[in-house]
Amino acid sequence: MTELKNDRYLRALLRQPVDVTPVWMMRQAGRYLPEYKATRAQAGDFMSLCKNAELACEVTLQPLRRYPLDAAILFSDILTIPDAMGLGLYFEAGEGPRFTAPVTCKADVEKLPIPDPEGELGYVMNAVRTIRRELKGEVPLIGFSGSPWTLATYMVEGGSSKAFTVIKKMMYADPQALHLLLDKLAKSVTLYLNAQIKAGAQSVMIFDTWGGVLTGRDYQQFSLYYMHKIVDGLLRENDGRCVPVTLFTKGGGQWLEAMAETGCDALGLDWTTDIADARRRVGHKVALQGNMDPSMLYAPPARIEDEVATILAGFGQGEGHVFNLGHGIHQDVPPEHAGAFVEAVHRLSAQYHN
């Protein structure tokens, strides 16, 4: 494989010295970029874009042509696994993702296959291989998956949800069925991420978007337990290099200590967590990624710079920080504001590394 020219993102995840704080943005390949909209129109629809390796590669690389980002992230969707299980994923205008055949009971769970990463999900691996080739070693490639709990919420609710009553009903009335589903998903995610690593992903991230809707006890049992199983089963070295793992539970700032016990290398923080407090609590054990409010990118560049300075000062001197937003970039953010953000992180962070 090509020698990596910029490895500061991987070094920061392993709490090794870097010259400046690395930065990337969740959803950095997305609708705020006019070139993304043009490529998506060419593909026809979102899943066609995901399933075409050349176009998925093109949109992955688009933000890197605009900004000096320190990592690329695979362009895909967290719902690829449930789609490959046969739930019939489709996208409703203004409604987000929906499934034609949601999971309603234990019998439904028992029928679900564990998808073959090089079979039904082979298009994802083709995209990973294509992106790695086209990156030419400029920056590392991040692979990812949704967490078992987060995938289960979509599968049981039949799509996006605000109250999560359907899956919580299953959790409290038929926990055995939910545990069976989560166990299948944990096995599927482990296979899926390991296949991404073998195909060329140099770091992986598990997105637990909806873990924060659970009580502390339920989070441990129904979300964290299964993420821990995945971390235990992941390839942690490939191509002679360590493959770092990041866990991100949105709304999970109160559980950082338990998350750090999983053996992951880094924790993603949303914008509601104080990064100085997070570093005091778990910085001796894991790197931290985050955590500017994505809405700050609507502000004038000078205000964005102030916020970057505040977060850098909050983390303080030394290693183990990857700068990011606290969640995905919004689709109507001016692209030049994202550029001001990336530039400010690199310029203002040098003083914290010596």
Curated annotation (Swiss-Prot):
Its EC number is 4.1.1.37. GO terms for biological process: protoporphyrinogen IX biosynthetic process from glutamate. Pathway: Porphyrin-containing compound metabolism; protoporphyrin-IX biosynthesis; coproporphyrinogen-III from 5-aminolevulinate: step 4/4. PROSITE patterns: UROD_1, UROD_2. It is an enzyme of class 4 (lyase). The record marks 77 as: Transition state stabilizer. It catalyses: uroporphyrinogen III + 4 H(+) = coproporphyrinogen III + 4 CO2. It is found in: Cytoplasm. The keyword Nucleus does not apply. Signal peptide: none annotated. InterPro entries: UROD/MetE-like_sf, Uroporphyrinogen_deCO2ase_HemE, Uroporphyrinogen_deCOase. Gene3D superfamilies: 3.20.20.210. One of its GO terms (cellular component) is cytosol. Substrate binds at residues 27-31, 77, 154, 209, 327. Keywords: Cytoplasm, Decarboxylase, Lyase, Porphyrin biosynthesis. Transmembrane segments: none annotated. One of its GO terms (molecular function) is uroporphyrinogen decarboxylase activity. NCBIfam families: hemE. Catalyzes the decarboxylation of four acetate groups of uroporphyrinogen-III to yield coproporphyrinogen-III. Belongs to the uroporphyrinogen decarboxylase family. Homodimer. This is Uroporphyrinogen decarboxylase. It comes from Salmonella dublin (strain CT_02021853). The lineage of its organism: Bacteria, Pseudomonadati, Pseudomonadota, Gammaproteobacteria, Enterobacterales.
